[in-house]
Amino acid sequence: MDDEVYKQRLTALNNLRIVIFFDILIILLGYIGTWNLKTLQLVNPSLWSFSPSLWIYIRGTVLCADCIFTAGSANEYSAVQNSVFQVSSLMFYGLMMEFFGYSFDRVGCMELAFISFSAACYFNIRSIKSLSLKNKNWTIISIIEIPIKLHFILNVLLFLKFSEYMLPLLGRVHLSYHLFALWVINLYIWIKLIDSKDFVLGFLAGLSVLLLNTGSLITAKPLISYFNLLTSCLIIFPSIWIYAIEKKNFKNLSYEDDDYRNYW
């Protein structure tokens, strides 16, 4: 492979590493001053110990940085192959829609926030489908696939939250609705997990729903909560099992290997 193209690829991957760093950073910032994971705090920042209003600005800044580095990755990757450019572009569009959703939430336009998070979910799904058509190596899984699927799960939860503003009757069953919706997500991911052996999406979804069903929800709606916890575990453990079986099929290649250089 041409050295210039190889250099562009490494630059793009390094940009996406920065995206992961920002994503992890913003999650950690939400836990400042909190020892126990609070229920639905990913969906509802007002439940965080960190200032909700300040969190909106921090999240917006991080998403803008994500967009910049993802767009840079798409630009670098366009010289390598159009299919990879498409993945990075879809990731960029999803991040932009997510940013618009938080912005509309900040100014009180709940309907526009709902539309924005719906669009973010759409672009996330397209990114995941595009990735599923490719062979996997650990670089692609860790740098591209995991951030996309983390954003997808978060956007689905935000989509559920803002759907209540579009369907006023759901406000009367706020708690039950969220719990039931999480179970539906679990069921869908479980089906996709068996169908595509997508251990990354299965594990992240199962773990997120497991964490979101802690605390007061268990005492408020014990039957639905425990059912969610059970289905979460039924997703997490098969995900690990599938990973153990499929691990040998992944190409654990280094940057210096010729096969890695010719991967895309």
UniProtKB/Swiss-Prot annotation:
Keyword Nucleotidyltransferase: no
Predominant location category: endoplasmic reticulum
Keywords from the named record: Endoplasmic reticulum, Meiosis, Membrane, Transmembrane, Transmembrane helix
Membrane topology: Multi-pass membrane protein
A GO cellular component entry from the record: endoplasmic reticulum membrane
Compartment(s) of residence: Endoplasmic reticulum membrane
Superkingdom in the source lineage: Eukaryota
GO biological process, one term: meiotic cell cycle
Keyword Transmembrane tagged: yes
Record-annotated membrane-spanning stretches: 18-38, 54-74, 84-104, 140-160, 174-194, 199-219, 223-243
Cited function: Has a role in meiosis.
Protein name, UniProt field: Meiotically up-regulated gene 162 protein
Protein species of origin: Schizosaccharomyces pombe (strain 972 / ATCC 24843) (Fission yeast)
